[in-house]
Regions:
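Signature aromatic-anchored transmembrane alpha helix within multi-pass, membrane-resident enzymes
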Residues: 58-64, 246, 250, 271-275, ...
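Transmembrane-helix signature of polytopic, membrane-embedded enzymes
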Residues: 60-62, 161-185, 199-203, 217-226, ...
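Short helix- or helix-capping micro-motifs
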Residues: 66, 174-185, 210, 227, ...
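Hydrophobic/aromatic-rich transmembrane helices and adjacent perimembrane loops
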Residues: 90-91, 198, 237, 243, ...
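Transmembrane-helix motifs of polytopic, lipid-linked glycan transferases
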Residues: 145-169, 206-211, 371
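Hydrophobic, aromatic-rich transmembrane alpha-helices
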Residues: 156-159, 250-260, 341-386, 391-393
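Perimembrane helix-loop-helix junctions
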Residues: 222, 243-283
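Catalytic lumenal/periplasmic loop and adjoining terminal transmembrane helix
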Residues: 286, 423-584
C-alpha cells in the first residue's frame, strides 16, 4: 500500500475528506429513506427531460457551464501555480508551439538545464504528446495564458461526454451524467485545475466511443471523422491507454460496417483524416527524436531505469549527474515495479490501483451506482463497452504506474456504468420505492458535497480535487515572482541542499533561453565549474539560489507576497568575479 498512499496520491488530509463525503452520503441516504415519498420531488422532472431532448443545445450548455462555471469559481478556488514535473514539461511544449516551433535546439551547456520529463537530446522538448500542449498553446496565443487552453479542453471533454452518453442513454440521463462530470471533474479535479493532463484523454475517448455507436446505427461519414479525430487525440495524449480502448472499439466498428456492407463514402473521410493525422504525428516525432518513435520512448531510453510495464526489464544503462535524478529514478519510481515482481505484490498493487481510481472517479457518493455494470452488460448496444473496459483493465494493471489521467481514456465507459446504475434505481422504484429514495439521496449527496468542497474544505490543497494532493514547492511562487519583477535579465544558479526532495523542481525554462527574462540553471560544482555558464550569459545579473526544502515555514502573513528581505535567506548575488577569475586561470 505504501507504493501509492504517499506524497503524490492520497495523503492523510484526503482521508479526512473521504470521511466527510462518506458521512454526508450516509446522512443524505438516511434522510431520503426516512422521508415520505411524496415530498421527494428532486429528479427527474419534465422540464429537465424536455430540455435534454434538444441534444445539441444540451451539449452546448454543458460546455458553457464547464468553462464559465470554473471561471466564476476563481474568487473561491483560484488557479495555482504549476508545481509538478509533468506540468513544467507540458508548459515547455506549449511555449514551443505558441512560438511556431515543433521543437527546440539543444541549448549550449545543456547539463545545467536538465529537468524531469524533458528531452535534451537530440532536441530540447517535452517527452509528452502534442495534443494537450496544442490546446494550451491555443489559449496562450489567444489570451496570453495556457490556463484558457486547459479550460477549453476540459469544457470540450465534458461536452463530448454528453454527446457520447446520448448515443447509449436517454437524453436526460446523458445530460445528468455530463453535469456530474462538470462538478466532479471539470471544476474540482486536477484535470481542469492543473497542467497535469486528463481532459484531452477524456475528449479523445468519448469521441471514439460516441462515434462508434453512431456508425453502428446510422453510418454517417461525419461520424467517421469524429472517430478519426478521437483516435488522433488519444495517440497524441495517452497512446498506450488509448490503444487499449481503441483497438476493441475499432475492430467492432469495422466488423459492423462490413456486416452492413457500408459504402465507400462512409469509410473514406475518416480513413483519410486518420492517415493525414498519422503522417503529421510521425513528422512531429521525427522532428523531436530523429526517429519515428514517440518522444516518451526516447526519454525512457535516455533517462529512466524503471520500465513502464511490470513485466519489463530495468534500463541500467542510464547515468545520472545529479543526485535528485538518481534518487527519483532509482529509488522512488521503481517502488511499484519491485513490489509487483511477486504474485502477492502484484495483487496488492492491482488492488491499490483500483482503490485510487475509485477515489477519483466514484468516491462514496457514487458507489451505489456501480451496480450499473449489470444493466450495462445486459444492454446489447453497450455490452461491447463493458468488454472493452475489461480488456483495458488487463493493460492498466500491467502498467508500473497508474494514475487517474491514464484511465481518463475510459471515462466515458465509467460514467455510462454509473448512469446505468442510477437509471436502474429509477426503474426498480416501480417495484420498491426505496430505490427511488436511494437515487435521490445519491444525487442530493453530490449537491451537498459541492458546497462542502467549495466552502468547508481548505482551498490551499493543490490541485483541488477529490482524490489526490501533489507537491507544493516551498517558496516557489514568491521567489519566482520576485525574480520576474526585477529589471534587466537574470541567471539564477540553483544549488540544492543535501536533503533536497526531488519533487521540488526549480529548473524550469521556456522554449528559448536567450529571450527569457530569468534563466534557471543547475549548480554543477564541485564536479564541474559554473564559470562557463556564467560566461555564456555576460549580459545577465547572476544569482545563487539555495531553495527551501520540506519543513520550511513560510512567512506568518500569507496574505502578502514575500519581499526581497524575506527571500534574501535563500537568494544571493553570485560572485561577480567568477567569470573573470575563470578566464584568468585559463590564461
Amino acid at each position: 500500500m505504501t507504493n501509492y498512499i504517499r506524497f503524490f496520491h492520497i495523503k492523510m488530509d484526503h482521508f479526512t475528506f473521504l470521511e466527510i463525503e462518506t458521512w454526508v452520503t450516509l446522512a443524505m441516504l438516511l434522510f431520503f429513506v426516512l422521508f415520505p415519498t411524496k415530498c421527494l420531488a428532486f429528479f427527474p422532472n419534465r422540464g429537465f427531460r424536455r430540455f435534454a431532448q434538444q441534444r445539441v443545445r444540451a451539449c452546448l450548455v454543458v460546455f458553457l457551464l464547464s468553462f464559465f462555471g470554473r471561471v466564476a469559481l476563481l474568487p473561491i478556488e483560484p488557479f495555482t501555480v504549476p508545481n509538478i514535473h509533468d506540468e513544467f514539461s507540458y508548459l515547455l511544449a506549449s511555449d514551443t508551439f505558441t512560438h511556431g516551433r515543433l521543437t527546440n535546439p539543444t541549448p549550449a551547456l545543456w547539463h545545467h538545464f536538465e529537468g524531469f520529463y524533458v528531452l535534451m537530446q537530440p532536441t530540447f522538448q517535452s517527452k509528452y504528446g502534442a495534443a494537450q500542449p496544442l490546446f494550451m498553446a491555443l489559449g496562450q496565443r489567444l489570451t496570453g495564458t495556457p490556463r484558457v487552453g486547459i479550460l477549453l479542453s476540459m469544457a470540450l471533454a465534458a461536452a463530448s461526454l454528453c454527446w457520447m452518453l446520448q448515443a447509449y442513454l436517454p437524453a436526460e440521463w446523458a445530460l445528468l451524467g455530463a453535469l456530474l462530470a462538470v462538478v466532479r471533474i471539470s471544476w474540482f479535479s486536477y484535470f481542469g485545475n492543473s497542467y497535469w493532463g486528463g481532459s484531452v484523454a477524456i475528449l479523445g475517448g468519448c469521441l471514439v466511443l460516441g462515434a462508434a455507436a453512431r456508425l453502428a446505427r446510422k453510418s454517417e461519414p461525419h461520424d467517421g471523422l469524429w472517430m478519426a479525430l478521437g483516435l488522433l487525440l488519444l495517440a497524441n495524449s495517452r497512446p498506450f491507454e488509448g490503444a487499449l480502448i481503441s483497438l476493441p472499439i475499432c475492430f467492432y466498428t469495422v466488423w459492423v460496417l462490413f456486416r452492413k456492407r457500408a459504402r465507400l463514402g462512409i469509410w473514406l473521410p475518416g480513413t483519410a483524416a486518420l492517415f493525414a493525422g498519422a503522417v503529421c504525428t510521425g513528422y512531429y516525432c521525427h522532428r523531436v527524436t530523429g526517429h519515428f518513435t514517440f518522444p516518451w520512448t526516447t526519454y525512457w531510453q535516455q533517462w529512466s531505469i524503471c520500465p513502464p510495464f511490470v513485466f519489463g526489464k530495468p534500463n541500467h544503462s542510464v547515468h545520472y549527474q545529479f543526485a535528485d535524478q538518481l534518487i527519483y529514478n532509482r529509488d522512488y519510481e521503481t517502488l511499484p515495479y519491485v513490489a509487483a515482481q511477486t504474485p502477492m505484490g502484484f495483487f496488492v498493487e492491482m488492488v491499490v490501483k483500483a482503490i485510487y481510481q475509485w477515489l477519483f472517479f466514484v468516491f462514496p457518493a457514487l458507489s451505489l451506482a456501480l451496480i450499473g455494470w449489470i444493466p450495462t452488460l445486459r444492454a446489447r448496444k453497450s455490452r461491447v463497452l463493458l468488454y472493452t473496459l475489461a480488456f483495458a483493465c488487463f493493460g492498466f494493471v500491467c502498467e508500473t504506474w497508474l494514475q487517474a489521467h491514464y484511465v481518463a481514456v475510459a471515462s466515458g465507459i465509467v460514467y455510462l456504468i454509473l448512469l446505468n446504475g442510477l437509471r436502474w434505481m429509477r426503474v426498480s422504484a416501480r417495484q420498491h420505492v426505496v430505490w427511488l429514495k436511494l437515487l435521490r439521496g445519491t444525487l442530493a449527496s453530490i449537491v451537498c458535497m459541492f458546497f462542502v468542497r467549495l466552502f468547508v474544505v481548505p482551498g490551499n490543497t493543490f490541485p483541488p480535487d477529490w482524490a489526490s494532493q501533489t507537491a507544493d514547492i516551498p517558496g516557489y511562487r514568491d521567489i519566482t515572482r520576485i525574480m520576474e519583477g526585477k529589471p534587466g535579465k537574470h541567471l539564477v544558479i540553483v544549488r540544492y541542499r543535501p536533503d533536497h526532495f526531488w519533487g521540488y523542481s526549480w529548473i524550469n525554462n521556456g522554449y528559448d533561453l536567450q529571450t527569457q527574462h530569468v534563466i534557471w540553471a543547475r549548480d554543477t560544482e564541485p564536479l564541474e565549474s559554473n564559470v562557463p555558464l556564467v560566461c555564456a550569459f555576460p549580459d545577465r545579473h547572476v544569482w545563487l539560489l539555495i531553495p527551501p526544502e520540506r519543513g520550511f515555514m513560510p512567512p506568518a502573513d500569507r496574505t502578502a507576497p514575500w519581499d526581497a528581505d524575506a527571500a534574501s535567506r535563500f537568494l544571493q548575488p553570485y560572485p561577480s568575479t567568477a567569470c573573470y577569475l575563470g578566464s584568468a586561470a585559463r590564461w
